[in-house]
From Swiss-Prot:
This is Phosphoadenosine 5'-phosphosulfate reductase. Keywords: Cytoplasm, Oxidoreductase. Belongs to the PAPS reductase family. CysH subfamily. GO terms for biological process: hydrogen sulfide biosynthetic process; sulfate assimilation, phosphoadenylyl sulfate reduction by phosphoadenylyl-sulfate reductase (thioredoxin). The lineage of its organism: Bacteria, Pseudomonadati, Pseudomonadota, Gammaproteobacteria, Enterobacterales. CDD domains: PAPS_reductase (cd23945). The gene is cysH. InterPro entries: PAPS/APS_Rdtase, PAPS_reduct_dom, PAPS_reductase_CysH, Rossmann-like_a/b/a_fold. It is found in: Cytoplasm. Its EC number is 1.8.4.8. The keyword Glycosyltransferase does not apply. It catalyses: [thioredoxin]-disulfide + sulfite + adenosine 3',5'-bisphosphate + 2 H(+) = [thioredoxin]-dithiol + 3'-phosphoadenylyl sulfate. GO terms for molecular function: phosphoadenylyl-sulfate reductase (thioredoxin) activity. HAMAP family: CysH.
């Protein structure tokens, strides 16, 4: 697998681009998560960035990537509606792992948005999507542009939802390479990694949360619920950051 040129790959017809990515993904599937990170740092173009929601398993990918690239910018899109425990978790991990945290927010404050649009998350799928565009998608796009990102690491896993079940290790998203080193990990592997390296789950894990986002669109897990149903009232799984 030789070094990839982002501009050249972006310029290819979609069929040729897909074929090139499929070829390298066939090889990346057989590598460990650590080997995938190493391969990306050697073969994909910098600038490198890592995004994190500082959710339940966030410490895994943050530790995995920063062990090999300690100063990598870690992008957080802060909606202003995260749980207090999430902000405390962010502070704790930033100090413990010495993260190069880069926080991006919507151009309008939460209070201003509510004054202008009302509580968008209570306005069905359309309202949730508008909320996500304002508070997550636009800030992430701005982060990638501001940081000059060409390769983006993220901690998604296929096991998390149906919408992620077929994601490849490597893709092109928002015009940059996107690499998912732990895409094929299961919950057991996550637990083993955290335990092995003295890392913790998000504090709300012990209170019954399987997935953590904003306070107003996150629910505790209850018997009979899927993980997907604990977010956005079960109306959708993705917040827009990881949708093509």
């Amino acid at each position: 697998m030789s070094q990839f040129n982002l501009n050249e790959l972006n310029a290819l017809p979609k069929a040729e681009q897909a074929a090139a990515l499929a070829l390298v993904n066939g090889q990346l599937e057989h590598l460990t998560a650590q080997e995938r990170v190493s391969w990306a740092l050697e073969n994909l173009p910098g600038e490198f960035v890592l995004s994190s929601s500082f959710g339940i398993q966030a410490a895994v990918c943050l530790h995995l990537v920063t062990r090999q690239q300690p100063d990598i910018p870690v992008i957080l899109t802060d909606t202003g509606y995260l749980f207090p425990e999430t902000y405390q978790f962010i502070d704790s991990l930033t100090e413990k792992l010495q993260l190069n945290l880069q926080v991006f927010r919507a151009q309008q404050s939460p209070a201003w948005q509510e004054a202008r649009y009302g509580k968008l998350w209570e306005q069905g799928v359309e309202g949730i999507e508008r909320y996500n565009d304002l508070n997550k998608v636009e800030p992430m796009n701005r982060a990638l542009e501001t940081l000059g990102a060409q390769t983006w690491f993220a901690g998604l896993r296929r096991e998390q939802s149906g919408s992620r079940a077929k994601l490849p290790v490597l893709a092109i998203a928002r015009g940059v390479f996107k690499l998912l080193p732990i895409i094929d990990w299961d919950n057991r592997q996550v637990y083993q990694y955290l335990t092995q390296h003295g890392l913790s789950y998000h504090p709300l894990w012990e209170q019954g949360y399987l997935s953590v986002g904003d306070t107003h669109t996150t629910r505790k897990w209850e018997p009979g619920m899927s993980e997907e149903e604990t977010r956005f009232f079960g109306l959708k799984r993705e917040c827009g950051l990881h949708e093509s």
